[in-house]
Amino acid sequence: MAVITMKQLLEAGVHFGHQTRRWNPKMKKYIFTERNGIYIIDLQKTVKLIDDAYDFIKDAASDDGVVLFVGTKKQAQEAIEEEAKRAGQYYVNHRWLGGTLTNWNTIQKRIKKLKEIKAMAEDGTFDRLPKKEVALLIKQRDRLEKFLGGIEDMPRIPDVLFIVDPRKERIAVKEAQKLNIPIVAMVDTNADPDEIDVKIPSNDDAIRAVRLITSKMADAIIEGRQGEDDAPVTEDTFENTDDQVDSIEDIVEVVEGDNDSTDAE
């Protein structure tokens, strides 16, 4: 049974790609058709590739792999943080700092500074310092927390990256490639799939689409850690019903009637 059904993907708007003038020809094999100037992603392929991504992430988690969730665009920030935390993993949901992976030693020094300032706030040190100095420390702490809080407790360089919108996160992609870290990513019709190890053709702009797929990657981690008997059920997952959409022709019918509701541009 598929990890996500075609009906769930349709309800989340996963099938809506970008405008036809904004595409990468390498994504052609993942595109079913074009409607009203919008590319429509072939969800039959997406269903299968989500299964592949799920198994890949699950296998990594079962080997105690560290998974880093990356998504800094507004539509992804909340889901990236919440699902990474739910899976007991790590995340970057604001600006990716250059060298996060390739200069890990320097990043660790910044994380150490963040922890030191937090300790000062908790052990009463702030009470003994001038107000101006405390204000500066708080400002520094908040900035470090914003960019590094999601990887503060990451024990080592991750074994896998899950990325929403690899075009936007191109620096993270390049760093992972340099270190031979496999990438699982949601690739929209304007992305280069050749840069990604495990591809999920998907709308990466719609909040519901991002949430649905990100939550499934978190489920894969939890299942990998716990075993199949404890496979998780998420509240955010769309409900399965008997009236499953199971043909590409049905997709076209839905698209023709619903194309105006797309989030993609």
Curated annotation (Swiss-Prot):
One of its GO terms (biological process) is translation. InterPro entries: Ribosomal_uS2, Ribosomal_uS2_bac/mit/plastid, Ribosomal_uS2_CS, Ribosomal_uS2_flav_dom_sf. The keyword Ribosomal protein applies. One of its GO terms (molecular function) is structural constituent of ribosome. GO terms for cellular component: cytosolic small ribosomal subunit. Gene3D superfamilies: Glucose-6-phosphate isomerase like protein, domain 1, Helix hairpin bin. PROSITE patterns: RIBOSOMAL_S2_1 (PS00962), RIBOSOMAL_S2_2 (PS00963). Keywords: Ribonucleoprotein, Ribosomal protein. Belongs to the universal ribosomal protein uS2 family. This is Small ribosomal subunit protein uS2. The gene is rpsB.
